[in-house]
Amino acid sequence: MQFNYSMKNIPMSSTVQAYMKKMLNQGENFLRRANWAAFFAMNKHITQSTLETFGFKNPNAPPFVKEFEEFKKAFLEMIRNIKFTHTGNDFQTQLKSDTFKIKHTPEIIVPADKTRNWYKVPIGDHKKLLEEAVTKEYKRCDQEDIDKVNEETAKIAHTLQLHDRMEKFTVRDAYITLKDHKPNFPSRISTRLINPAKTDLGIVSHRILQELNSEIVSQTKTNQWRSTKSVIGWFNRIKSTARTTFIKFDIENFYPSISRELLVKALDWASGFCKISDRNRGIILQARKTFLFIEGKPWTKKNTVNHFDIPMGSWDGAECCELIGLFMLSKLTQKIFKPDEVGIYRDDGLGTVRGPGRVAERKRKDISELFKEYGLSITSDTNLTATDYLDVYFNLEDKSYRPFRKPNDHPQYIHKLSNHPKNIIKQLPKMIAYRLSVLSSTEKIFKEASDIYINALRASGYTDSDLDDFRYTPPDPNKKKRRQRCRRVIWFNPPFDLSVETDIGHKFLALVGRSFPKGHPLHSTLNRNTVKISYCTMNNMKSHIDQHNKSILNPRTVEANNNGCNCIRSRKAECPLDGKCLQDSIVYQADIIPSDPNNNLGTKTYYGCTGRPFKKRYYDHKNALSNRDSSKQTTLSKHIWELKDKNVEHRIKWSIKARAATYKGGARYCNLCLSEKLTILMADQESTLNSRSEILGKCRHKWKYCLGSIKIN
């Protein structure tokens, strides 16, 4: 399946509702942070918790702050009144057409591993390829194994006081990419297995390992590279002679080759530079207990102890590899190299050798034996006067370096007409030119390398006038970073879309200035310097393919969500939802209609949502409507009891307003709750019984996925 553009291009929103959902989600996140900031500003006697949260959000709704309420109401009204316009262009028409084709393709659309190709694979063939990849390295395990690991993780979460924020092990099915760069493709298909299932403890482990690695690098001064820029700095410091050559090595299957014993040895070694508490060590090792899922069924890695694994894409996988890299660098610099002669980036190493070819060959064998001693195997090249490393090509003979791309790897960039914020479109040529400048040792090399990138930009709709800023900008090593005040900023990140007519940025900043002028109690906390806006984006083309694949692999059939009605035959006519009372995952609507049409009260509407079959939620409402002790359970029951006290005859008509999926572990938000909140926001405020304060309410569907819901023995 061919796409002649970057999959990072973004089509315009297919529906207004899709945009408004994301806007409301981003707006809710902003309001929560701003509301908490306002609460602590108005209650200075309450000290903010010094608890380390590792980025996990507080699930609770923020408290009421009188001074913040007017801004909150105006902000939600701003979102409600966003205007849209009909717009488009030829490129957006093409994206819309391709999105439609993707959505209606019956096959799985699988990406290539190292190229930009995409392949349609029938469901049966995809299942076979996936099973072959999984059974090669994994074996089946039981749900009890996952429950045990979750219970162990829950104990740690309780000690961190984050049990109400951290979630159980996420159940996400593994997927594959096709290695179409391998020989004999497609007659012989090789795949790469990707495991997206993660543990939240990996986020904690990520922070611990990141700080640990930084401390080790600071003390040892070893060349643990984290960027191309640091490799170039090392290259420029090389004092090369006529006999200086490169030696390059690559650790094969680095992630899966790391054993528990090797990680423990690396931690023991690291403890000599920085104290590693028993708690932190336990967190790192507990985060290694990993599972893989196919159709929701768990698998665990073969030949490992206690489910140990470091899957690619895990929260702390890269940091684990960096720690192992630092450990191996220490061994290399003790036995084979001087500290300034070798460095490593993840699984790629690069060093220099002075002397004849036999010296380099001996070092190659020594490196291979050293890594083999720790259960790792490498491939290596020696006696190189020039070589590629990461995205740079280094030449020792003339001490030059230039940008490097693999053969047939042509760059692709977002189109000028993509649904991206204008500043990103405008700055892209300048950003690419600066990157090429960093990767080029001279202006001449920059100009020689520029053609392929300029042509790629032109293919993406950029004109010559757009490329005026595409020029060589040599990095200044003596340039000092501008000192910036460490100010706590609360960001609002609304989604950008070309179809939006309203100038959201202008209206938002004007609202902040108008709501919190000088003299306002919250001005020092919420002002134009502490509250800022930066646009996020809608789903790109790759996201649309991912969503398509999920819908094919995990079909939610109509029957699964349309279980009909189980009311007894003689009372079918009284079914509250017209024969659909067993439907789940819905936003429902209750219209309270006075029996007397001349009644001045008029029809009132209540909106709610349920992830359970509607009938169970209906019985909860029915109990509240017949039991005065439960009259304040919802605004619906409160209103009904007010009507009863006034002897107003009425009837309730139930209906389905929207359908949406309930929250799943690891998701960014609950689609069902968000649909309910959007319905409340857009409802007529005169006739609805719901309050907009419900928009900041806590999701009721997340708790069962939290570690706090586990009973610890």
Q: Where are each of the predicted segments found?
A:
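Non-catalytic, polymerase-adjacent accessory regions of viral genome-replication enzymes
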Residues: 1-187, 466-476, 481-497, 501-515
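Conserved pre-motif C helix in the palm subdomain of viral-like polymerases
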Residues: 171-218, 252-256, 304-334
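Boundary/linker segments flanking structured domains
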Residues: 435, 439-582, 643-713
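Amphipathic alpha-helical blocks
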Residues: 139-180, 218-230, 248, 257-261, ...
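Polymerase palm active-site segment centered on the conserved acidic dipeptide of motif C
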Residues: 276-280, 343-344, 351-430, 447, ...
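Conserved short loop/helix modules at catalytic or binding sites
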Residues: 389, 611-665
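GIY-YIG nuclease signature motif recognition
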Residues: 177, 205-208, 250, 313, ...
